Amino acid sequence: MTRVAVNGVTGQMGGAVIEAATDSEVVVGFATSDTDAVDDVPVVHPAEAAAALREYDVDVVVDFAVPKGALTVAEACVEAGVPMVVGTTGFDEDGLARLQDASEEIPLLKATNFSQGIQVLQRLISEAVGTLDDYDLELMETHHNRKVDAPSGTASSILDVIQEERDVEPVYGREGHAPREDDEIGVFARRAGDVRGEHELVLAGNDEVLSLSHRAEDRGVFAAGALDAATWLVGRDSGWYEFGDVVDA
């Protein structure tokens, strides 16, 4: 059974990973809070992560935290030689570069979304945008009111997929008094209630509209996907991996 450490264990996704770990064992968690344990899982401060990874004989780390904490634990994983699955979003360019550096020493899988449905959605979007190359594009995402980064990491990944097919300029939260330009894509983020995650791309042409969307009903789907990625990552060579590699395996 894969021995997993969870970074951000006191958060909602951390709890979801513990709950979803039926074929893996969560042996330790990392958090900056004063909590000693979560569901009988001991909690250690991220600054002590390297020692804890050795003490608890951890096979792989699953991370759903904030960028600063994720980078601290990534350094610990490099020190201890432990693979890491990074689900944290909102990294700046320096943070992403530091993760890339870590992937030269350990297997590191970075994903903005661990849903198989999102993987399929991105492939459908790539085909649709490439085929309907003169259609207007609008991208919308909705998440719970506690999410701090906007647009979501998944929306940013979808935008990357679109820009691989078309040279479009994102317009965030459209406002003002001017017509739409042909080479732009509207990107909108909504924060309300306890929405797990909704993403939709609208492609609009003359007299027809195509909508491609995905809705997560429960955050457990992300936790299960992250654990699948963690099990898959153990034993891999050092390098940078993505969730699509797991889905295609």
From Swiss-Prot:
<dbReference type="GO" id="GO:0005829">
    <property type="term" value="C:cytosol"/>
</dbReference>
<keyword id="KW-0520">NAD</keyword>
<keyword id="KW-0521">NADP</keyword>
<comment type="similarity">
    <text>Belongs to the DapB family.</text>
</comment>
<dbReference type="InterPro" id="IPR022664">
    <property type="entry name" value="DapB_N_CS"/>
</dbReference>
<dbReference type="Pfam" id="PF05173">
    <property type="entry name" value="DapB_C"/>
</dbReference>
<dbReference type="GO" id="GO:0008839">
    <property type="term" value="F:4-hydroxy-tetrahydrodipicolinate reductase"/>
</dbReference>
<feature type="binding site">
    <location>
        <position position="144"/>
    </location>
    <ligand>
        <name>(S)-2,3,4,5-tetrahydrodipicolinate</name>
    </ligand>
</feature>
<keyword id="KW-0457">Lysine biosynthesis</keyword>
<feature type="active site" description="Proton donor/acceptor">
    <location>
        <position position="143"/>
    </location>
</feature>
<dbReference type="InterPro" id="IPR036291">
    <property type="entry name" value="NAD(P)-bd_dom_sf"/>
</dbReference>
<dbReference type="GO" id="GO:0051287">
    <property type="term" value="F:NAD binding"/>
</dbReference>
<dbReference type="GO" id="GO:0050661">
    <property type="term" value="F:NADP binding"/>
</dbReference>
<keyword id="KW-0560">Oxidoreductase</keyword>
<keyword id="KW-0028">Amino-acid biosynthesis</keyword>
<comment type="function">
    <text>Catalyzes the conversion of 4-hydroxy-tetrahydrodipicolinate (HTPA) to tetrahydrodipicolinate.</text>
</comment>
<feature type="binding site">
    <location>
        <begin position="111"/>
        <end position="114"/>
    </location>
    <ligand>
        <name>NAD(+)</name>
    </ligand>
</feature>
<dbReference type="InterPro" id="IPR000846">
    <property type="entry name" value="DapB_N"/>
</dbReference>
<feature type="active site" description="Proton donor">
    <location>
        <position position="147"/>
    </location>
</feature>
<dbReference type="GO" id="GO:0016726">
    <property type="term" value="F:oxidoreductase activity, acting on CH or CH2 groups, NAD or NADP as acceptor"/>
</dbReference>
<keyword id="KW-0963">Cytoplasm</keyword>
<dbReference type="GO" id="GO:0019877">
    <property type="term" value="P:diaminopimelate biosynthetic process"/>
</dbReference>
<dbReference type="GO" id="GO:0009089">
    <property type="term" value="P:lysine biosynthetic process via diaminopimelate"/>
</dbReference>
<keyword id="KW-0220">Diaminopimelate biosynthesis</keyword>
<comment type="pathway">
    <text>Amino-acid biosynthesis; L-lysine biosynthesis via DAP pathway; (S)-tetrahydrodipicolinate from L-aspartate: step 4/4.</text>
</comment>
<feature type="binding site">
    <location>
        <begin position="87"/>
        <end position="89"/>
    </location>
    <ligand>
        <name>NAD(+)</name>
    </ligand>
</feature>
<feature type="binding site">
    <location>
        <begin position="8"/>
        <end position="13"/>
    </location>
    <ligand>
        <name>NAD(+)</name>
    </ligand>
</feature>
<dbReference type="Pfam" id="PF01113">
    <property type="entry name" value="DapB_N"/>
</dbReference>
<feature type="binding site">
    <location>
        <begin position="153"/>
        <end position="154"/>
    </location>
    <ligand>
        <name>(S)-2,3,4,5-tetrahydrodipicolinate</name>
    </ligand>
</feature>
<protein>
    <recommendedName>
        <fullName>4-hydroxy-tetrahydrodipicolinate reductase</fullName>
        <ecNumber>1.17.1.8</ecNumber>
    </recommendedName>
</protein>
<dbReference type="InterPro" id="IPR022663">
    <property type="entry name" value="DapB_C"/>
</dbReference>
<dbReference type="InterPro" id="IPR023940">
    <property type="entry name" value="DHDPR_bac"/>
</dbReference>
